[in-house]
């Protein structure tokens, strides 16, 4: 086998490979003979079909198959010999062929050489927080509101009330699409509507008709409404006040806490909040570390890896549409390109961190991750056993553990400063509610 390597552009490589033509001819001949023994063709006894007949019927397909196998086999031998690491599947193009040699060209991308830089320049502000009694009480108050019942009242609407309204919106005297509704139920103070709408309903009684002026935010999702001043003609049809359940042992039973009453519920709430806080703190630090790693390191990315990641993201997006996806056109690649590039770059850089630090997934950490996740379910042990008996799920958890270990390795050289934060403020930012 003769091999020549050519760098065409960036990470793309072109191998010109020449092998003895006999490799193909012998394999084709053997395959035709084997097919002749197996073939069942009218007019011929089983096993007695002439090779010439088989060649006429199947020769072209057999030769194509054998040629593909020969190219694949010799390509693998060539990249091993040349110490090349393909980042995607090659494309094969048969070249010049004579009685002596068969030549073909393989074009593919290789992984970039990654040399980590600026690890000591990564800056991380590590938040620290804890769940206080006040945080637990605030969560209980939230749960009370979620389990509130409502009854009609004859008074002015106030924050926390539920209002049933009809409304018609207009801009410069013209109604706009989506700006009209009847018997619309709105919880005042929920932040569901644009700023000024809910507060504009407060202070009015059922039966009143009134107008409010509001301005759509500059980042509003509808392009034609961004920054526009609108007038809403509103009819308040009913005001309902919330009746909150008392906080006692009966309240605890609403959440499946049969034994231990209210105190047991508080323990469970604190445990769940602490788990969520720990996950959010980890995610915050991880994002900072990865952002710093990306800023300090520029590497060329194989297009094959980006295309593959785009397809993964596209499939995930389509799955979220459920049954509607079948009637939708394929989502364009450029919707996912930026995210795909980031994921590929992070993967390559973290791979080098793992390699440099000789990291391997820690089994204890893997089990701790599974146990933490399982604790959110009704039967944690069942979830743990499910993971431990599922090879694919276990590999996913090993990858998560290995990524955590890589982030921790980067933290050792990063510039880290601690900052105390409040639970509610931090979690609101983490969940996008701030």
UniProtKB/Swiss-Prot annotation:
One of its GO terms (biological process) is 'de novo' cotranslational protein folding. Coiled coil: none annotated. This is Trigger factor. It holds the Pfam family FKBP_C. PANTHER family: TRIGGER FACTOR CHAPERONE AND PEPTIDYL-PROLYL CIS/TRANS ISOMERASE (PTHR30560), TRIGGER FACTOR-LIKE PROTEIN TIG, CHLOROPLASTIC (PTHR30560:SF3). It catalyses: [protein]-peptidylproline (omega=180) = [protein]-peptidylproline (omega=0). Involved in protein export. Acts as a chaperone by maintaining the newly synthesized protein in an open conformation. Functions as a peptidyl-prolyl cis-trans isomerase. It comes from Shewanella loihica (strain ATCC BAA-1088 / PV-4). Consists of 3 domains; the N-terminus binds the ribosome, the middle domain has PPIase activity, while the C-terminus has intrinsic chaperone activity on its own. Its main location: cytoplasm. The keyword Cytoplasm applies. The keyword Isomerase applies. One of its GO terms (cellular component) is cytoplasm. Residues 160-245 form the PPIase FKBP-type domain.
């Amino acid at each position: 086998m003769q091999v020549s390597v050519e760098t065409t552009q960036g990470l793309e490589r072109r191998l010109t490979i020449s092998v003895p033509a006999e490799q193909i001819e012998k394999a084709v001949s053997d395959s035709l003979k084997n097919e002749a023994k197996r073939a069942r063709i009218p007019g011929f006894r089983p096993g007695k079909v002439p090779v010439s007949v088989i060649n006429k019927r199947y020769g072209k397909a057999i030769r194509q198959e054998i040629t593909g196998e020969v190219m694949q086999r010799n390509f693998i031998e060539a990249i091993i010999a040349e110490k090349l690491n393909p980042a995607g599947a090659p494309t094969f193009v048969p070249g010049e062929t004579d009685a002596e040699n068969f030549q073909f060209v393989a074009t593919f991308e290789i992984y970039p050489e990654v040399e980590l830089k600026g690890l000591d320049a990564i800056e991380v502000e590590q938040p620290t927080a804890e769940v206080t009694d006040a945080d637990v009480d605030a969560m209980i108050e939230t749960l009370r509101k979620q389990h509130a019942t409502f009854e009609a009242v004859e008074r002015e609407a106030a924050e926390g009330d539920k209002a049933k309204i009809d409304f018609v919106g207009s801009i410069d005297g013209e109604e706009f699409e989506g700006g009209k509704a009847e018997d619309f139920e709105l919880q005042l103070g929920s932040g569901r509507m644009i700023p000024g709408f809910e507060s504009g309903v407060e202070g009015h009684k059922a039966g009143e008709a009134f107008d409010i002026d509001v301005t759509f935010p500059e980042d509003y999702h509808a392009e034609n409404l961004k920054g526009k001043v609108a007038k809403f003609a509103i009819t308040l049809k009913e005001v309902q006040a919330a009746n909150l359940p008392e906080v006692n042992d009966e309240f605890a039973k609403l959440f499946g806490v049969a034994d231990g009453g209210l105190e047991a519920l508080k323990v469970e709430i604190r445990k769940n909040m602490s788990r969520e806080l720990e996950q959010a703190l980890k995610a915050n630090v991880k994002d900072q570390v990865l952002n710093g790693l990306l800023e300090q390191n520029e590497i060329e990315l194989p297009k094959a890896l980006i295309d593959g990641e785009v397809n993964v993201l596209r499939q995930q997006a389509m799955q979220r549409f459920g049954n509607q996806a079948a009637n939708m056109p394929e989502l364009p690649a450029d919707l996912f390109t930026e995210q795909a590039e980031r994921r590929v770059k992070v993967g390559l850089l973290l791979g080098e961190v793992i390699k440099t630090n000789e990291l391997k997934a820690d089994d204890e950490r893997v089990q701790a991750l599974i146990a933490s996740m399982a604790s959110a379910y009704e039967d944690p042990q069942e979830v743990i056993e499910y993971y431990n008996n599922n090879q694919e799920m276990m590999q996913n958890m090993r990858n998560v553990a290995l990524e955590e270990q890589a982030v921790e390795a980067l933290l050792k050289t990063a510039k880290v400063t601690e900052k105390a934060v409040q639970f509610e403020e931090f979690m609101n930012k983490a969940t996008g509610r701030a």
